[in-house]
Amino acid sequence: RSSDLFGSLVKQYHLKQTADRADWLIGEGLLAEGINGKGLRSMSEPGTAYDDPLLGKDPQPAHMKDFIKTREDNGGVHLNSGIPNRAFYLAATAIGGYAWEKAGYAWYDTVCDRNLAQDADFDAFAKLTIAHGEKRSGSDVGAAIKQAWEQVGVL
């Protein structure tokens, strides 16, 4: 989810954290006392944010092989967001440094791109992030982004 990604970047910027120092958690501290979990979602390890008898287990997949096909949640847009979230985490940590400086710009440029269709699938989105990463930051960044999407099974 773009909101997860950009929220995480704002937090990292505020804390002056490099990609390898960030916790990559969304909603940490929001779970009630006694709930077994560290947050609502994990960008680094989707599906591991919580596992509790009351809440159940974090359902987010980290790889396309576990993609959830459903009519609920607008086709699983929130459930399956663990896949692109993990791709961003992998790209940002592979590139190194501050995630907002290179990987973040590639994703930002992608969501601002008029060529990004409203109903774009992960494949189309991934290809645009690679192109924007290369355009703004060079072929090494584009290659790291491509490898991240390959690692989560999108490409």
Indicate where each model-derived feature is located.
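Zinc-dependent metallohydrolase catalytic domains
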Residues: 1-155
